[in-house]
Amino acid sequence: MKAPRQSARRSQIGGRPRRAEKKESTRQAILRAALALFAQKGFYRTTTKAISLKAKIAEGTLFNYFETKEDLALYFLDQELDGVIDWFHHDKRVQGAPLPERLFSIIYLFLERLAPYEEFIGAVYLRALQPSSKLSPLSLQSQEHNVRYLRFVRDILAEAEREGEIPKVGDIGAYAFALFHLAMITYWLQDRSPGKEQTLAMLDRCLKMATHLLKKGAWDW
């Protein structure tokens, strides 16, 4: 009688990854449906009912995965962060580049990934300004995402410190870059130049200036 119980136990263990994969697949399907509707109708005019119909699931099932559209937005931002971190860790050329180029590449890739969803991102950032929003930097729901991003940036700056590219900046360097990143996204949202070229020029100039100031402590850049 032991063998059947062991077999059942193995079946249960083997079923867990499959259930997790199915749940993640459902989350991805919901996100794709939501992003398509956000592009058509906008973030505010898209209802959870419309998202569930587009994703071909019951509205109650949608709420099991995402309580609100803000939860969907947080999931989207997590997916984008995962993509950028994975890209950075696999791109040896960027990892070996000077610090300004590494930091430029990170923000550039974020902007490139966000470009198809510009209106949605604008709505998300406006919601993030509301203290009661889950998207607010002060909310508990957004803290895990923010800390992962800060650690990612801090690791890059720490390597630059070890290589002597910049003096020790500690955690404040990661916070400063995060604020700069936010400022660049805000500028990008307002940029109406062809190909957002003004944003890219501003990004390049600011990073070169900041790195020079850290290394030389002078304004002659």
Regions found by a protein language model. Give the residues of each.
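Secondary-structure edge/capping motif, primarily at the C-terminal ends of alpha-helices
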Residues: 88-95, 124-132, 160, 188-192
